[in-house]
Amino acid sequence: MLLSLLFMTGCTDDGGDQVAQELSQNAALQERPTLEQEQARLTVVRDQVRDTLASELGLTAWNEADNGNAAGCADYPESDGFTAFLPLLALTGGVPDQQWADAVAVVEEVAAGAGFGGAETVVDQPGQHEVVLRGERESLLRFGTTKNATLRLEVGCHLTERDHS
């Protein structure tokens, strides 16, 4: 009976699995650029999209609407990585319906040069539009308009310079 109790309560170490997952996920993230490098790269992409929308379509009233933020990684929950959200750019007055298709084409063209795929429609109705483009390493570009337009880039999971070797 004592042997059965010892066997049933045995020496299982779920903590070992968690440590192994953390090591595995951190090793995968070591293959990626640092969070800071990816933030810098995607900030350039965001600014190129903004500048091209301004020069080609006259959409010029952009401003930074927040400071951005960071969170843990849903895809790598045991890792030391972070997902970052670049500061949101807002366009006062939005994109008129008659310019929406051209604006999406501009966003797709600029973003494609940085490894993003084509635009996936989230909402497309008069006065309200939104697309998302998926990039390398789980990055996302969100572009939408209602009364005002927004341009937001989300950096996929990366280790900070401190945690990257």
Per-region residue spans from a language model:
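Sec-dependent N-terminal signal peptides
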Residues: M1-L3
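C-terminal motif of bacterial Sec signal peptides marking the signal peptidase cleavage site
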Residues: L6-G10
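An acidic-aromatic pocket/loop used at catalytic or ligand-binding sites
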Residues: T12-L57, G94-A101, A112, G118-S165
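Compositionally biased P/S/T/G-rich terminal and signal peptide-adjacent segments
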Residues: Q37, R41-P87
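Mature extracytoplasmic domains of secretory-pathway proteins
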Residues: Y76-G118
